[in-house]
Amino acid sequence: MLEKIRSPKILFDILEIMIYKRKLNLIKYNKKIQKRLNIDHTSYNKFLIIKEMNEKYQLNIKGPEHNVLELENQNGTEIFEYINKIRFNNLTTLNLQWANIDNLTSLEKINLSKLRILNLNFNNISEINFIQAFKLGNLKELSLFGNNISDIKAFEDIKFENLEKLDLSRNKIKIINISQKVNFPKLKELNMSYNKLIDIGSFNQFIFGQLEKLWISGNEITDINVLEKLNLKELKELYLNSNKISDINVLGKINFKDLNKLDLTSNPINNYLCSDTIYKLGKDINRFYK
């Protein structure tokens, strides 16, 4: 069988799996059985083999500094059943995209303190309260694209000290029901496009320090005056397209020092009312109105 396989990558994976199966069988039938199995590095293929282990083994996966666990497009219940038997010491990336899960409460015992990237795209998540249970002080990227989230009030109780990218696009958020300040000192990209946003007045509860890209396109927003109250000095790209905005004069009052992309397409903008603003913005911005 191995002679017919030309791809070095596939061949390597198959050989690796065979070796791991051999190791597991040796341990399984050894009278002096080990209670803990240390595996130097984890990958998806090895994870599948690990599942064959007897339940009484406590697995300790020790990876390199940047330990990545990819479990995309799997059954959430089955994933949690086996992840909870594994002790992660240095997990920095966790990909649970298309995993058919609605929360992460089953993983509360897992050490995610070093996690930097968490991908939960395309699941059935409607509540984000579970995030509070994890110590995610080192998290840099949180992606919740394509879920059923309608309420983000839980952000009031979460400290995003190092978060740089937050993707909440294509959810069901209508109103930003936040009444307390939420600090995003290092956030550079915020994507809330293609939700059901009508009112973004509560955006003034967000404290941005380094925001460079903001997407709120594809909603039902009519009033964008709140943007004047935000710290957008570092903003480079602003996407407001596909909303119901008719008055954009507030944009002329904001000091967009580095803005080079402003998308206002597919909005019922009043050209006469906003002519001065359109002219002012058009002098310095590459793409602003069509």
Question: Residue locations for each model-derived region?
Answer:
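Structural signature of tandem-repeat unit edges
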Residues: 48, 69-71, 94, 102, ...
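A structural signal for leucine-rich repeat
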Residues: 83-87, 106-112, 129-137, 153-161, ...
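C-terminal capping region of solenoid repeat domains
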Residues: 233, 237-242, 257-290
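Conserved hydrophobic beta-strand positions in leucine-rich repeat
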Residues: 69-71, 94-96, 115-120, 139-144, ...
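Conserved small-residue-rich
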Residues: 60-96
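Cullin-RING E3 adaptor/co-adaptor recruitment helices
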Residues: 1-75
